[in-house]
Curated annotation (Swiss-Prot):
Region of interest (Alpha N-terminal domain (alpha-NTD)), residue spans: 1-238
GO MF annotations in UniProt: DNA binding; DNA-directed RNA polymerase activity; protein dimerization activity
Annotated Pfam families: RNA_pol_A_bac, RNA_pol_A_CTD, RNA_pol_L
Compartments, as annotated in UniProt: Plastid, Chloroplast
UniProt name for this protein: DNA-directed RNA polymerase subunit alpha
GO CC terms of this entry: chloroplast; DNA-directed RNA polymerase complex; mitochondrion
Lineage: Eukaryota, Viridiplantae, Streptophyta, Embryophyta, Tracheophyta
NCBIfam families for this protein: rpoA
Written domain comment of the UniProt record: The N-terminal domain is essential for RNAP assembly and basal transcription, whereas the C-terminal domain is involved in interaction with transcriptional regulators and with upstream promoter elements.
Chief location bin: plastid
Function: DNA-dependent RNA polymerase catalyzes the transcription of DNA into RNA using the four ribonucleoside triphosphates as substrates.
Organism domain of life: Eukaryota
């Protein structure tokens, strides 16, 4: 989304606020919501966006099947009499089952079904603390009157865990476990002028897709709490710090001026890597020239100095001045 929806811009200045502007259930295993956080100072949106994205994809716990035990099976690609799918296919299907658990402990579940019939998630005998999100998720097809017995291990964790081949023994097969309940996260940053047009502000727009075991709103809450917990040690350290002399602290933490400049420039590049040059509102000539030299974001533009632009063929002084003026006006920045 490159164009700013003016209806989302807060009507009055003040503290940043967070709200859901769209929410829908696309299927039992796909929930979608869109949020905005605004108004923010220039640079704050990307900082928050990066932290929240990491927390949403890596910190929120989810529940899934991590191991399946079959009777008289020794290899993942084995087939079973009367079962249409191979063991490998059943493992893949089991991996996709979306579950929700109130317990953090590893638990067992069972499938014990006589065919012929189709086996779905609703046929899993689950502990009382675990529920299935989509009962019709396919697991296997029994083509004749035989019994399918599978013992399942269910765990709750965060992130992703690869299978351990060493555990392929005694009919036990581990699967690649995708614990995160978040399917996808997108965010974009949009700049707008304050009401008196004296300063630029930012709006952070967030889109979240979940697997149905958690709503995007709940995910935002969990990710926020996780992110806040990261900074608690700094608050606790304040109570425990020793009584150093102010001048000693200042001297020990001081950076050489040249180092400070480099650090500041690197911070700016990271901050503006998601802000596109469209926000500068340049003339077609200046805009097209920047695109031609692969300058797509403000971060890309910071790789060039004023002299670099002036020396480029077919790039006039007027266009350079326009870029410098737009950078200063919208972001309070100058090229080296």
């Amino acid at each position: 989304m490159n164009d700013l929806d003016l209806n989302l811009v807060p009507p009055t200045a003040g503290s940043a606020y967070w709200r859901c502007v769209e929410s829908k259930v696309e299927s039992e295993r796909l929930f979608y919501s869109r949020f905005i956080l605004s108004p923010l100072k220039v640079g704050q949106a990307n900082t928050i966006g990066l932290v929240m994205r990491r927390a949403l994809l890596g910190e929120i716990k989810g529940t899934c099947i991590t191991c399946a035990k079959f009777e008289n099976i020794t290899h993942e690609y084995s087939t079973m009499d009367g079962i249409q799918e191979s063991v490998h296919d059943i493992l893949i299907n089991s991996k996709e089952i979306v579950l929700k658990s109130k317990s953090s402990e590893a638990q067992k579940a069972f499938i014990s079904i006589v065919g012929p019939r189709r086996v779905t998630a609703q046929d899993i005998e689950l502990p009382t603390s675990v529920e299935v999100i989509d009962p019709m998720q396919h697991i296997a097809t029994i083509t004749k009157k035989v019994k399918l017995n599978i013992e399942l291990k269910i765990e709750k964790d965060s992130g992703y865990r690869r299978q351990n081949i060493v555990e392929y023994k005694d009919g036990n097969f581990t699967v690649d476990a995708v614990f995160t309940p978040i399917r996808s996260v997108n965010y974009s940053i949009h700049c707008f002028e304050s009401h008196d047009k004296s300063i630029m502000k930012e709006m952070l727009l967030y889109e979240i897709w979940s697997n149905g075991s958690i709503t995007p709103e709940e995910a935002i809450y969990e990710a926020s709490r996780s992110s806040i917990n990261l900074f608690l040690p700094f608050l606790q350290a304040e109570k425990e710090k020793e009584d150093f002399k102010g001048e000693d602290i200042h001297e020990s933490n001081a950076l050489h001026p040249s180092v400070s400049i480099v650090v500041d420039q690197m911070a700016k590049k990271v901050t503006f890597q998601h802000i596109f040059i469209e926000q500068l509102e340049l003339s077609p000539k200046a805009y097209n020239f920047l695109k031609k030299i692969n300058v797509h974001t403000i971060s890309d533009l910071l790789d060039y100095s004023q002299d670099d632009l002036m020396k480029m063929k077919n790039f006039g002084k007027k266009s350079v001045e326009q870029i410098l003026e737009a950078l200063q006006k919208r972001f309070g920045m100058r090229l080296q």
